[in-house]
Each structure stands twice: as C-alpha cells, then as structure tokens.
C-alpha cells in the first residue's frame, strides 16, 4: 500500500487560460542545497497584475495562462477572491436542489482510495436539471485525457469522482461577454484579471465541495461553457489535495492543456518553451529532471538526469539529446528533445518526460491494489483479489516461500496456495512489480514495487 504524501500548504498558484491544469506543489520539503540553488537562480518574476495593483494588499496567486490554443503561456498574478461585481447575493437553493447539491459519484473506481491517485471533478454552472449533463462531460473529458500516454497504460492507477455543485443559473460569468454575470455554485468567471481566457474560481468554495469526496489528490472544476479558457492552481489544500484546475466543459483543447499541466504537477517537469527576452540563464543547475545546463556529452559523462535516454528515438519525434532553450530561457538551458508536449500542446511526452510521469503516478498510487483487508485473519477458503497495472506482474509467497505456480494470478485463496488445515497461523504475501521499460532510473524504479501481507488462520 502506497503511503499518502504528507499534507502541506502553498499559496502559490498557476493558471492557464486554455483548459484543464492539474498542477501540484513540486516538493514537500527542500534541502539546504536546494534552498541555496533557489537563492542563486530565482525564477523570473511575473509581471505586475493589473487587478493586484488596483486592489492593494489583497491576497493574490501567481498564474500561467494561454491566450489561444497552441500558444505558449505567460505569467501574471490574480486576486484570490472573487471580484466584488460577481459576489452578489445568491438565491438560496430550493429543498430538492439542496438535496442534490454535494452528491458524490464514482465515475471510475479501480480500487480503494489508499491505493489510487484520486481525481475529483466538480461542476460549476450546471443547474439541478443539468447534473446528468455534467456527469457525461466528466466521462468525456477523462476519456480524452486518459487516451494520452502514459495515462493510457496506467488507467488502473486512477479513481475519478464527480461532485455535484448545483448552480442557480446555467453557464458561467464572462461568457459570452465580460458583462455577463451568472449565479453559480463556485463563482467561475472568465476575464479574470481582465484576461478574457483566464477562468478563475472561488477556491474556498471548491475546497468545501472537494471535501465531500472520499479522497482527493487532484481537483478539477469543469465549468459549463464552450468558450476557450481555464485556470489551474498550484497549491495543496488544508484537506490534502494537490492542485485545482478549471476548464471549459465543451472546448476541444482543454484535455491537451490538462496533459501539459500534469507534467508540472505529477511529473515535476519544467516547461520546455522559451522567450527571447529572457536572454541567457546564468543560475545554478535546475532541479527539474528535464532541464539542464549540461550538454549531451556532459550529461553522459557525468551520468546526470536524462543521460540514460540519449540517442534513443522519442515518441514526440526525433532523438533524445540536449536541445538549447527551455524553462523560459533561449540560452544557457537545454531540454531533452526538440518539441515535446512540455513545449507545444498536442505533442507527446518525450522519453524522459514519460519516465517522470510514471514515477509521479506511483508517488500517489500503488502497483498493487486490493479490496481484501489485512486487518483481520483470513480463512483458508477466503478469496484474495488484487489489481495491477497492465505492465506489472505479481508473485505470491506463503510464510516467505514463493509459490511459483501462482505467478501472475489476480485472485487466489490460501488453500490454493497450499496452506493446509493444520490449525496453525500462516502469512500470504503478494509482491507486485511494474516491469515497464519506460522507467530506467533505479531510484525511480523503487516506486514501482509494492507488497501486501495477509494473516491466515488454518
């Protein structure tokens, strides 16, 4: 069973106008070395926010946004609170509406929350009569995301939950025009910080609904709109989830932005695009696994970062090497391939990126899932059932000795493993290992093995 990551809190926020963003805090703790690195090479500051400047000391979030499909993002800051013009008095929900508000549904449940990466999707701008539409939108959006590698190969690691947030009006504020104001449960609105495509939300309201789900590692707000836009928040809430995303429910590009943004949250990957005005990077070696000051020859000689992949053909096209430009700088930083999804929407993850994503999945989920509890002793005829990713195998052992005939089986009984009715206590252990060739780093491969032990009373 994978141990849950420790809860932590960050007010840093990233947003993207253009679709889902599933981003997360990049580290629970920082070493003294990392702190020194951060001091030596601070991130470029975002430009001043128009809204933040106008509203003084109001709490703000740093954001990243896309102004159009396929464009590279820009950075700014936005107010954390819903603008006053949108914070008008809400009509109370009727009794039937209130009864439906906050309902939780399992869209996809592959196993217990302790074993899985749990994604919670909350609807906004859907009336009580439109909740079935919301559920259909959740299924559609997740199908698009999970068709992309490495998601497609690891669907068994995810649970997806929907939480119904009943709105008084259909649609969201700012759609189609800036003057449109809608009475919705989560206060989603376009024109955040006067940027048309930036789709912001009341994060406190989001947290109140997310708390209704069995568990939440990532949270998505699906806003009832066809308009191009979205926002994502890189934070960890006080109830434990990493990241909030907003997205237009019916825009075709939102899933691609989601995949890009989870590269940050789950894969801890840097952006691979750059801006000419940033000049030359002169700071310390970046922390992210897909950005380096080193050349391909230096990476190989020093056995650093993606050196194991250099020279191999990558699914995003071309060969893994060291391509100049990345992490916003055109000079002084190299990226693994010319044009992965961390640079351009619609592309694939490159080989180092896929490795990082798979490792990110396993930081939340386990290679071995089971609904058979380990708290109480089992009888000889009790069924032990497990779940595995497609690329994983399992070995079974009794009292520390492997039962080779049971290799690969996903359902066994202690009796079928050879435990006799001898009146003694025994243990049954399942050990699962993901044998994917997409993860080469030995340190990351340690995340790909998990085991579970049951006591048996014969």
Can you annotate each of these PLM segments?
Residues 131-150, 331-348:
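Short, solvent-exposed linear motifs at loop/edge-of-secondary-structure regions
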Residues 128-132, 229-230, 349-353:
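Short, solvent-exposed loop/turn elements at domain surfaces
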Residues 99-118, 122-127, 143-278:
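Active-site-proximal segment of zinc-dependent metalloprotease catalytic domains
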Residues 1-41:
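Secretory targeting and sorting signals
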Residues 134-141, 154, 254, 258, ...:
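Stable alpha-helical elements in mature extracytoplasmic
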Residues 2-7, 39-147, 385-388, 392-398, ...:
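Zymogen propeptides/activation segments of proteases
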Residues 416-421:
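Short, flexible loop/turn segments at beta-strand junctions in immunoglobulin-like
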């Amino acid at each position: 069973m994978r141990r849950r990551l420790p809860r932590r809190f960050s007010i840093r926020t990233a947003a993207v106008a253009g679709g889902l963003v599933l981003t997360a805090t990049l580290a629970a703790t920082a070493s003294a070395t990392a702190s020194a690195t951060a001091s030596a090479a601070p991130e470029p500051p975002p430009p001043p926010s128009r809204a933040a400047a106008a509203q003084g000391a109001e709490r703000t979030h740093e954001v990243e946004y896309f102004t159009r499909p396929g464009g590279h993002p820009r950075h700014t800051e936005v107010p954390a609170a819903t603008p006053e013009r949108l914070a008008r008095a809400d009509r109370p929900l009727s009794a039937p509406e209130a009864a439906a508000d906050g309902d939780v549904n399992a869209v996809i449940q592959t196993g217990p929350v302790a074993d899985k990466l749990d994604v919670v999707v909350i609807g906004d701008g859907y009336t009580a009569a439109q909740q079935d539409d919301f559920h259909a939108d959740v299924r559609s959006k997740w199908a698009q995301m999970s068709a992309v590698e490495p998601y497609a190969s690891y669907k068994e690691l995810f649970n997806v939950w929907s939480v119904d947030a009943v709105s008084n009006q259909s649609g969201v504020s700012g759609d189609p025009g800036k003057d449109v104001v809608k009475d919705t449960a989560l206060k989603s609105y376009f024109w955040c910080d006067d940027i048309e495509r930036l789709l912001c939300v009341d994060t406190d309201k989001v947290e109140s609904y997310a708390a209704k789900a069995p568990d939440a590692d990532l949270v998505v707000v699906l806003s009832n709109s066809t308009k191009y836009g979205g926002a994502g928040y890189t934070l960890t809430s006080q109830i434990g989830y990493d990241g909030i995303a907003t997205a237009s429910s019916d825009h075709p590009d939102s899933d691609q932005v989601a995949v890009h943004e989870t590269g940050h949250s789950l894969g801890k990957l840097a952006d691979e695009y750059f801006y000419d005005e940033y000049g030359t990077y002169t700071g310390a070696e970046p922390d992210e696994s897909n950005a380096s000051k080193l050349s391909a020859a230096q990476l190989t000689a020093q056995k650093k970062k993606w050196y194991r992949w250099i020279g191999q053909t990558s699914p995003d096209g071309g060969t893994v090497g060291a391509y100049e430009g990345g992490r916003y700088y055109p000079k002084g930083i190299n990226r693994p391939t010319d044009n992965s999804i961390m640079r351009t929407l619609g592309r694939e993850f490159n080989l180092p990126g896929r490795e990082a994503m798979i490792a990110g999945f396993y930081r939340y989920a386990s290679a071995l899932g089971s609904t058979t509890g380990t708290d109480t002793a089992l009888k000889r005829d009790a069924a032990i059932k497990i779940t595995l990713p497609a690329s994983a195998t399992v070995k079974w052992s009794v009292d520390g000795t492997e039962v080779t005939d049971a290799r690969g089986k996903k359902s066994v009984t202690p009796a079928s493993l050879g435990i006799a009715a001898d009146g003694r206590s025994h243990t049954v252990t399942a050990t699962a290992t993901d044998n994917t060739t997409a993860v080469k780093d030995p340190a990351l491969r340690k995340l790909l093995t998990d085991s579970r032990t049951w006591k048996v009373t014969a």
